[in-house]
Swiss-Prot record:
Residues 305-319 are annotated as: RNA gate. It is found in: Cytoplasm. One of its GO terms (cellular component) is eukaryotic 48S preinitiation complex. Component of the eukaryotic translation initiation factor 3 (eIF-3) complex. It comes from Sclerotinia sclerotiorum (strain ATCC 18683 / 1980 / Ss-1) (White mold). Residues 166-177 have a biased composition (Basic and acidic residues). The keyword Metal-binding does not apply. Belongs to the eIF-3 subunit D family. The keyword RNA-binding applies. This is Eukaryotic translation initiation factor 3 subunit D. Transmembrane segments: none annotated. GO terms for molecular function: mRNA cap binding; translation initiation factor activity.
């Protein structure tokens, strides 16, 4: 073949200005080129050669399939692509490719759990996507076996449910808790105070003075301060002793002091500490406030939540309510509170050296113990009635009388003088369970990393520890003993072991917790002033169960005194049937 010169090639090129296929009348509309399209097409790029199909390369479903932001990259004219498809000469619908790859048939995931693909798993079907699905552990990855009944907020696809929340679900609603007391229609709301306002209050007071003391104290057993050997752990024993937590208005000593006009405000250390530490509280509670003349009594209802010891109330992932019959029912808040209250009662009685010859008697006997009615001996307890000055000026004096409690007495190792102790107990239920708040394993870390263990407890139980510290300070206790009690078996809540006891000076512990007593006294004075400005009657201060808000209600005079009426009505109805 003869070679072609460059000049011949150039001369053979079309002489027209444009290049490409020749334009015919079939591909023009009034002389303008066009392409067939559908009105349902999404207008986008004219051509995107980098985009993959919905199923990824080779039609395989991939991770992109589960991207919540994924949207088919439809281009202009895609809806009518069949018009440009190549017409096959013969039917190839029966043609198939034999794959030599093995399909996975596993239907189990993790430790015995049924595997349902969740968001983030590869190769799942679109209709089984569940977002944060039924088998997702709270705070875990998609598809892991967890607490199926805890997090069923819907996702996308076939398991569609509620709306999606923001980044890391920052705006999702928290778990809803029930109020500690039912708000009745005839209650009148007077004030609503948020915790931010309470945190700004401040009132400096004195250290208080003792008015009188009742009861007796046993000496603390220093053997519990020693770290127990792992092979010989101390078991928490059931020690039946009579202890009392009488409300303010039912205390015979406070009634006598009120008749003598000793103070304006009367309270117990449990009620007062809850009010002073209210900005740290998360769980709901309520305090009954009774104004009689110029006197104010801070009371509690029978079987109120103030008597219960909370567990991990301030944890970022606090314990959650479990369904009835669930294996995690022992780790729900109400069960943990009962367990912690039981532990504190028995621990305080077990660490005493009970000896009639070596006990410290107060000026008066226990005002609540009646030997003719009680079958159990009285617990080691001293009730000290103390007086504090909450006056803003000398012209308007306001004093507070509070009943404080001391649990034990101990000899000072240096001076040999008696020191008053308060004894409390922290409890560990399961460091790996939901609601543990990232706590360390006490059995392995309490000795080597004691500071880290205590710091974690300060974070997870800020309100509880603050209340104990306030009670110790207003009682003028020298040392606050904290016991560390754990379950013998994490799955059982009826057997416990004592892992160690640590003592602190209450004011040093308060400074570590950033606890301000002047802020607490300011809160007390503010709430009391609200009631003194009102008429005589009964009021209820309620902590909102789901918001950091306190509400003050005015209630009828007979409220909370007819708790047994409901039972009588039910019995009458049954008899009529």
């Amino acid at each position: 073949m003869a070679p072609i010169s460059l000049s011949e090639i150039i001369s053979a090129l079309p002489s027209e200005d444009s290049w490409g296929p020749t334009t015919t009348s079939e591909t023009t509309l009034n002389g303008v080129p066009y392409a067939p399209y559908s009105k349902g097409d999404k207008l986008g790029r004219m051509a995107d050669w980098t985009a993959e199909g919905k199923d990824g390369r080779d039609g395989r479903g991939g991770r992109q399939q589960y991207n919540r932001n994924y949207r088919d990259q439809q281009v202009y004219g895609a809806g009518t692509s069949s018009l440009f498809a190549v017409q096959l000469a013969e039917d190839e619908s029966t043609f198939s490719v034999v794959s030599n790859t093995r399909d996975s048939t596993k239907t189990r995931f993790g430790r015995g759990g049924t595997f349902t693909r969740g968001r983030g798993q590869r190769g799942g079907r679109a209709d089984t996507r569940g977002g944060r699905g039924q088998f997702q552990r709270v705070g875990g990855r998609g598809g892991q076996q967890g607490y199926s009944s805890y997090d069923t907020r819907g996702g996308r696809g076939g398991a569609r449910g509620g709306r999606k929340f923001g980044w890391k679900d920052y705006d999702k609603p928290q778990r809803n808790r029930d109020a500690s007391v039912n708000i009745k229609p005839d209650w009148k709301m007077l004030e609503e105070i948020d915790f931010n306002r309470l945190a700004k209050l401040n009132l400096d007071t004195d250290d208080g003075e003792d008015i009188d003391s009742y009861g007796f104290l046993y000496y603390y057993d220093r053997a519990f301060d020693k770290q127990p050997v792992k092979a010989a752990e101390r078991k928490l024993n059931v020690v039946d002793r009579a202890s009392y937590n009488v409300t303010t208005s039912s205390d015979p000593v406070i009634q006598e002091l009120a008749e003598k006009d000793e103070a304006t405000i009367f309270a117990t250390d449990s009620i007062l500490s809850m009010l002073m530490c209210s900005p740290r509280s998360v769980y709901p509670w309520d305090i009954v406030i009774v104004r009689q003349g110029n006197k104010v009594f801070l009371d509690k209802r029978d079987n109120a939540t103030l008597d219960m010891v909370t567990v991990n109330e301030n944890a970022a992932d606090a314990p959650m309510d479990a369904s009835e019959g669930s294996k995690d029912a022992i780790n729900q808040p109400s069960a943990l509170a009962e367990e912690a209250t039981y532990i504190n009662h028995n621990f305080a009685n077990q660490v005493m050296k009970e000896s009639d010859s070596q006990k410290v008697e107060m000026e008066h006997e226990n005002p609540f113990y009646n030997p003719s009615e009680e079958t159990d001996p009285p617990a080691s307890k001293a009730y000290k009635y103390r007086k504090f000055d909450l006056s803003l000026n000398d012209e308007d004096p306001v004093h507070l009388v509070v009943r404080t409690e001391i649990d034990a007495v101990s000899k000072n190792a240096i001076s040999g003088e008696d020191q008053y102790l308060t004894v409390k107990a922290l409890n560990e239920f399961d460091s790996k369970a939901q609601g543990s708040g990232g706590a360390l394993d006490w059995r392995t870390k309490l000795v080597s990393q004691r500071g880290a263990v205590v710091a974690t407890e300060m974070k997870n139980n800020s309100c509880k520890l603050a209340r104990w510290t306030v009670q110790s300070i207003i009682a003028k206790a020298d040392v606050m003993k904290l016991g560390f009690v754990s379950r013998a078996n994490p799955k059982l809540n009826d057997r416990h072991v004592i892992l160690g006891v640590i003592g602190w000076k209450p004011r040093d512990f308060a400074s570590q917790m950033n606890l301000s007593l002047s802020n607490g006294w300011g809160i007390v004075r503010t709430i009391v002033d609200m009631c003194l400005k009102r008429e005589e009657g009964k009021y209820v201060l309620v902590k909102d169960p789901n918001k950091p808000i306190l509400r003050l209600y005015q209630v009828p005079a007979g409220s909370f005194e007819d708790d047994g009426e409901g039972d009588v009505i039910e019995e009458n109805v049954e008899e009529e049937d």
